[in-house]
UniProtKB/Swiss-Prot annotation:
Keyword ATP-binding applies: no
Protein keywords: Ribonucleoprotein, Ribosomal protein
CDD domains: Ribosomal_L30 (cd01658)
Pfam family for this entry, one: Ribosomal_L30
An individual GO BP term: translation
Organism expressing this protein natively: Polynucleobacter necessarius subsp. necessarius (strain STIR1)
Origin superkingdom: Bacteria
GO function terms (MF aspect): structural constituent of ribosome
Quaternary structure and partners: Part of the 50S ribosomal subunit.
Disulfide bonds: none
Family statement drawn from the similarity comment of this UniProt entry: Belongs to the universal ribosomal protein uL30 family.
This protein's name: Large ribosomal subunit protein uL30
Keyword ATP-binding: no
């Protein structure tokens, strides 16, 4: 398990046009709204699952 203060940084690298509505909602839930926007979130299993769901749209920076 990860420590409580570890973070994961995400960047939206592909457009949401033509994607499923549930994937768009997941990207918004991750705090990303436009291409190249960056969000820093706690590294939890829930966030990891969201990243896995939209892995073709986002890039993990750190």
């Amino acid at each position: 398990m990860t420590t409580s203060n570890s973070k994961v940084k995400l960047q939206l690298v592909r457009s949401l046009i033509g994607t499923r509505e549930s994937h768009r909602a997941t990207v918004r839930g991750l705090g990303l709204d436009r291409i190249n926007s960056v969000s820093e979130l706690e590294d939890t299993p829930a966030v990891r699952g969201m990243i896995n769901k939209v892995s073709y749209l986002v890039k993990v920076i750190g």
